[in-house]
Design a protein with these regions (language model features):
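Conserved N-terminal phosphate-binding loop of PLP-dependent enzymes in the Aspartate aminotransferase
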Residues: 1-341
Length: 341
């Protein structure tokens, strides 16, 4: 299958077949394909696509993020080209600020293609074994993980809601994580690449009322264009001699799209988060009714508009439970059934 065009929530392939797009650019197209905002970016193309020096959109994007999205994080934002790059820069910043190298991350989390994030991934060939010594893997949604978060660590990075295990009952765990990181003087990084501007205008931090020291964004922020962003407390963001550069970082097209998407979110002209949460819940409820009625060992778990099919009817707390309860060939079975349709 090859996609030829996309409009609103639909994609059309080269044979003229039209489908509902349940991925929406892996979550980046929250206001739909071929929307009016993206057409405005076309005007920016006529004015130039890359200048190397700062463009007229970047300052506004920075101000919108600081004033309307994360007023608690008062430092200047750093912009790059993807969520992966944003997380790489956030880790580098945390290490530079603290003078420590060890970073905690959670099993089942996804922070992009950095070598140190891929230990558990099946496609992890070519990664030096000593890379993993700089990271400590923790168990998500399990209080025992706090014993492994120690003062010799620079930071802990976490998705407020994991894509592999999206759940709405996570506030208490996140607050305990926040408190423990404060106690041990370990920086807390929220990877909001997936949750930012999808769970709410203020992402997972806003929904669960837990504040990180550093935050990263991507996906929705670019409105369909490549983007990443790192923000944090001013004291942290002012750390000197940290390299963040990149040829296409903060390019006019991505920053124009980010400015337009933030203006839409701030004004709530099109995006209604309550409705998104209601639709997400309806999707889960109806599919779970079907799975129960058909006696299928499958369930849909989720938080707001974020949903995940799991191949077990047992309650899971984290990705570790999924690994224990799901059949080893669950994904292959699912792919096979899709091909039969």
């Amino acid at each position: 299958m090859e996609v030829k065009t996309a409009n609103k929530c639909y994609i059309t392939d080269t044979k003229g077949n039209t489908y509902i797009d349940t991925s929406m650019g892996s979550g980046s197209q929250i206001i739909g394909h071929n929307n009016a905002l993206i057409r405005e970016v076309g005007e920016q193309i006529k004015r130039g696509t890359i200048y190397t020096i700062p463009n007229c959109h970047t300052g506004k994007v920075n101000s919108y993020l600081k004033e309307h999205i994360n007023p608690d994080l008062d430092g200047q934002y750093i912009f790059c080209n993807s969520g992966t790059e944003a997380n790489m820069r956030a880790i580098r910043l945390a290490r530079a600020y603290t003078g420590k190298s060890l970073v905690g991350r959670f099993h089942g989390g996804w922070h992009g293609g950095l070598d140190g994030f891929l230990e558990e991934h099946s496609d992890n060939k070519g990664i030096p074994s000593d890379t993993n010594s700089l990271f400590r893997v923790l168990t998500y949604n399990d209080d025992q993980c706090f014993d492994k978060i120690t003062p010799d660590m620079a930071a802990v990075i976490v998705e407020p809601v994991q894509g592999s295990n999206p759940r709405s009952d996570i506030q208490q765990f996140l607050q305990k994580l926040r408190d423990h990181c404060t106690k041990t003087r370990v920086l807390l990084i929220f990877d909001e690449v997936m949750t930012g501007f999808r769970l709410s205008a203020k992402g997972g931090a806003g929904v669960f009322n837990v504040r990180p020291d550093i935050v990263t964004y991507g996906k929705v922020l670019g409105g369909g264009f490549p983007i990443g962003a790192v923000g944090g407390k001013a004291e942290i963001m002012k750390t000197k001699n940290v390299f963040y550069g990149g040829t296409f970082s903060a390019n006019p097209l991505s920053m124009c799209a980010a400015k337009l998407i933030l203006e839409t979110i701030i004004g709530m002209k099109h995006i209604q988060y309550d409705k998104l949460h209601d639709i997400g819940k309806l999707f889960r409820d109806e599919l779970n009714k079907f799975f129960i009625a058909e006696d299928k060992k499958m369930r849909v778990v989720g938080c707001g508009p974020l949903n995940r099919i799991i191949f077990t009817d047992r309650f899971i707390r984290n990705r570790k439970d999924r690994d224990n309860f799901e059949p080893e060939n669950a994904q292959e079975m699912f792919s096979g059934r899709l091909k039969e349709l």
